A protein has these predicted regions:
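N-terminal beta1-alpha1-beta2 module of alpha/beta enzyme domains
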Residues: 1-59, 153
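Active-site mouth loops of central-metabolism enzymes
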Residues: 1-11, 61-69, 149-160, 215-216, ...
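Hydrophobic faces of well-ordered beta-strands that scaffold small-molecule active sites
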Residues: 3-5, 28-30, 56-59, 86-90, ...
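Acidic-and-aromatic substrate-binding clefts and catalytic sites of carbohydrate-active enzymes
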Residues: 7-12, 32-39, 63-69, 182-186, ...
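Short, acidic/polar
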Residues: 9-20, 74, 159-167, 310-320
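Conserved, mostly hydrophobic/aromatic
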Residues: 24, 47, 78, 117, ...
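Alpha-helix-loop-beta-strand connector modules within alpha/beta enzyme cores
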Residues: 41-61, 113, 120, 343-350
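An alpha-helical appendage that flanks or caps ligand/catalytic pockets
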Residues: 103, 107-145, 186, 191-320
């Protein structure tokens, strides 16, 4: 089992990434949401220059913020700084789009973006289209020492909804899941990933599946309010994404369907002007717990979507996730969480 740490991209992420590397973490993941955090590629470049072994990935980029040749160039450049340590994590762009008041990218756009980037990063000449104009493109100076196309850059596709999960299984080298800690939610996502993988002649076991989530060690008598402050921001984000990712709620696991769908409007104020309502809804996203989310973030949903509990409970849950097919768990946090996770999980399970 590999272990990762999740950062809300900032220019000093390299300090925590280097600390995590020293503590035995294998991966570091950086949020890409231009209206919320710092620029992901600048933060990753700093981390690449300050670390030696930890792998660095986007969590996650998308097809809309940048055209595919720019995305590919970013990763080819990072691959010069950290050869063989770079991973492209990509999805449809939930917050990076919704913080603009825009919808997430379409699956066809995601597929095309991945295909163009994969081709360019392998040194191929690939078709590229804007509107009705279709041209062939390639990196023109691959051996100039400006970019690195020699070390492979794996592409992991993020998903929560059935169709996106199946596409991830079909076209991804790996799949990124959010908050799929409990058996029913993890089993639901893996079944769709398997379906997509089989469509491409692959097995689920061929894919690198990782779960990004929150982590909190509980203390005796700890209140629900304390847990909500600790992991509530990520619980709300993860569950909201699941609720928005289905066209028919019946597609979700029956035992937690209603709990998940309750998060559908977590970041929506129906009475606010449509032109500006998104400006307030995502302030403090994934970092601050908002009072209006208190009724939604129950003990049950905390257990279903995060690694919250005693050290023994968390280790047992990770073992179960590994048995089901997960190859990495990545947790959000700074130095205190990194230290606790390294002490109570990595040293015991690694």
């Amino acid at each position: 089992m590999d272990f990762g740490v999740i950062f809300l991209s900032h220019v000093e992420s390299y300090k925590e990434a280097a600390f995590a590397e020293a503590k035995g973490f294998t991966h570091a993941w950086f949020g890409d949401s231009q209206m919320v955090w710092a620029d992901v590629y600048q933060c990753m470049a700093l981390c690449a220059s300050k670390t030696t072994t930890i792998k660095l990935g986007t969590n996650v980029t998308n097809p809309s913020s940048r055209i595919a040749p720019v995305t590919a160039c970013n990763f080819a450049t990072l691959n010069m700084l950290a050869p063989g340590r770079v991973i492209m994590g990509i999805g449809t762009g939930n917050t990076s789009r919704r913080t603009l008041g825009m919808p997430a990218a379409k699956l066809a756009e995601l597929r095309t973006h991945v295909e163009v980037c994969r081709g360019l990063l392998s040194g191929a000449t690939v078709p590229y289209q804007e509107g009705e104009r279709r041209r062939m493109i390639k990196f023109l100076n691959p051996d100039s020492g400006l970019i690195n196309l020699k070390n492979p850059v794996p592409i992991y596709v993020a998903g929560s909804g059935p169709k996106t999960l199946e596409l991830a299984g079909e076209i991804g080298d790996g799949v990124i899941l959010f908050g799929t800690v409990g058996d029913s939610l993890l089993g639901y996502t893996l079944s769709h990933i398997r379906r997509g993988a089989e469509r491409a002649g692959k097995r689920l076991e061929d894919l690198y599946v990782l779960v990004l989530t929150a982590f909190h060690l509980t203390k005796p008598g700890e209140s629900l309010a304390t847990l909500q402050q600790a992991v509530g921001p990520l619980v709300t984000s993860e569950c909201n994404i699941f609720a928005l990712s289905v066209t028919n709620p019946d597609e979700l696991p029956g035992d937690i369907r209603d709990d998940l769908m309750a998060f559908k409007n977590a970041y929506r104020t129906p009475n606010a002007p449509i032109e500006t309502r998104h400006l307030d809804l995502y302030t403090g996203y994934c970092a601050e717990f908002k009072p209006e989310h208190t009724p939604l973030v129950t003990e049950r949903m905390i257990k279903e979507t995060t690694l919250t509990g005693t050290p023994e409970e968390i280790r047992a849950r990770i073992r179960k996730m590994q048995a089901m097919g997960v190859k990495q768990v990545a947790v959000a946090g700074g130095v205190p969480e990194i230290t606790e996770f390294a002490t109570h999980v990595i040293q015991e399970l690694g």
